[in-house]
């Protein structure tokens, strides 16, 4: 048997003693949300044995369970519900149980996710690691719940904007990435804006790179993301609070050539740019 980790398991202990039975009771009271152990006789051999089930408070390795009970017991991961195991282990009429059978299924899975979020460990990445099945099934609901109970504060700082323009191959993109890497906490803290309306994948990264830009972000939105006031960017199915500290924009053309609409004037845009460089 592999030494895997388990939270819910059933066990059989052949030819037990009363001390063994008492040890099972102590284990259940100390480590289980719900547990039951019953005395039985095998129908064909009349071998006395204990039939038990445990729903642990915390996952435990098979080797640890055997160390705390007995190395000779047979352990299996339980596939049935707590109530099914309760029925099975109590059929002889002589049994011990402690705690309440836990409800299984979606509601219990989601409650575990809620507990994690309320404990302050509720980033989407931590939920994905700790509760992968619930994350896959209920990603959208989990995301919205986190936004509701732990809203992201709006931006009230001026986002620093750097605009690098020049001919292809002059090193604009490389310089932007090098500078962003130096300022970001890690590579996951850098967001590359895809072309178009959507900001999918934006999660308040401190650094945003808008590479090879030639006017494909609407001018009014460009002015807003480069400013200091609260603003939400659009993702598919919702919005994200824009809070980034730095924006790099690279382009083959100067700011006065970015937009083609009548009466376009780049004064408001240039006023929001802290560093503007021609790289040749």
Swiss-Prot record:
Residues annotated as domain CRESS-DNA virus Rep endonuclease: 3-101
Short sequence motif RCR-1: positions: 10-13
Location (main, coarse): host cell
Binding site for a divalent metal cation: 40, 49
List of residues binding ATP: 166-173
GO BP: any one term: DNA replication
Keywords of the record: ATP-binding, Covalent protein-DNA linkage, DNA replication, DNA-binding, Endonuclease, Helicase, Host nucleus, Hydrolase, Metal-binding, Multifunctional enzyme, Nuclease, Nucleotide-binding, Nucleotidyltransferase, Transferase
GO cellular component terms, semicolon-separated: host cell nucleus
Active site: 88
Documented EC number(s): 2.7.7.-, 3.1.21.-, 3.6.1.-
Catalytic activity: ATP + H2O = ADP + phosphate + H(+)
Cofactor binding notes: Divalent metal cations, possibly Mg(2+) or Mn(2+).
A molecular-function term among this protein's GO annotations: DNA binding
UniProt short sequence motif RCR-2, positions renumbered to this chain: 49-51
Motif (RCR-3): 88-91
Localization (cell): Host nucleus
Entries under InterPro entries matching the protein: CRESS_DNA_REP, Helicase_SF3_ssDNA/RNA_vir, P-loop_NTPase
UniProt cofactor(s): Mg(2+); Mn(2+)
Record-linked Pfam families: RNA_helicase (PF00910), Viral_Rep (PF02407)
Free-text domain note: There are 3 rolling circle replication (RCR) motifs. RCR-2 is probably involved in metal coordination. RCR-3 is required for phosphodiester bond cleavage for initiation of RCR.
Its job: Essential for the replication of viral ssDNA. The closed circular ssDNA genome is first converted to a superhelical dsDNA. Rep and/or Rep' binds a specific hairpin at the genome origin of replication. Introduces an endonucleolytic nick within the conserved sequence 5'-AGTATTAC-3' in the intergenic region of the genome, thereby initiating the rolling circle replication (RCR). Following cleavage, binds covalently to the 5'-phosphate of DNA as a tyrosyl ester. The cleavage gives rise to a free 3'-OH that serves as a primer for the cellular DNA polymerase.
The family this protein is said to belong to: Belongs to the nanoviruses/circoviruses replication-associated protein family.
Protein name, per record: Replication-associated protein
Organism: Human associated cyclovirus 1 (isolate Homo sapiens/Pakistan/PK5510/2007) (HuCyV-1)
């Amino acid at each position: 048997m592999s030494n895997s980790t388990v939270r819910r398991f059933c066990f059989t202990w052949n030819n037990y003693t009363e001390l063994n039975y008492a040890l099972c009771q102590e284990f259940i009271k100390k480590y289980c949300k719900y547990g039951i152990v019953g005395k039985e006789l095998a129908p064909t051999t009349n071998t006395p044995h204990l039939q038990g089930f445990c729903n642990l408070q915390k996952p435990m390795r098979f080797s640890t369970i055997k160390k705390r009970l007995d190395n000779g017991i047979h352990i299996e991961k339980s596939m049935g519900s707590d109530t099914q195991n309760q029925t099975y282990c109590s059929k002889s009429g002589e049994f011990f149980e402690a705690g309440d059978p836990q409800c299984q299924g979606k509601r219990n899975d989601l409650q575990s996710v809620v507990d994690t979020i309320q404990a302050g460990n509720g980033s989407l990445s931590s939920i994905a690691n700790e509760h992968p099945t619930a994350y896959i099934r209920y990603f959208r609901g989990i995301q919205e719940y986190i936004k509701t109970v732990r809203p992201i504060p709006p931006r009230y700082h001026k986002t620093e904007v750097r605009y690098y323009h020049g001919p292809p191959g002059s090193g604009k993109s490389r310089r932007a990435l090098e500078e962003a890497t130096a300022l970001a906490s890690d590579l996951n803290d850098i967001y590359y804006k895809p072309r178009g309306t959507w900001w999918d994948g934006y999660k308040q990264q401190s650094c945003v790179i808008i590479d090879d830009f030639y006017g494909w972000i609407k001018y009014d939105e460009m002015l807003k993301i480069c400013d200091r006031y609260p603003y939400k960017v659009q993702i598919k199915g919702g919005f994200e609070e824009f809070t980034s500290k730095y924006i790099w924009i690279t382009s083959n053309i100067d700011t006065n050539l970015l937009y083609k609409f009548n009466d376009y004037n780049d004064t408001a845009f240039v006023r929001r740019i802290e560093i503007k460089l021609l790289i040749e």
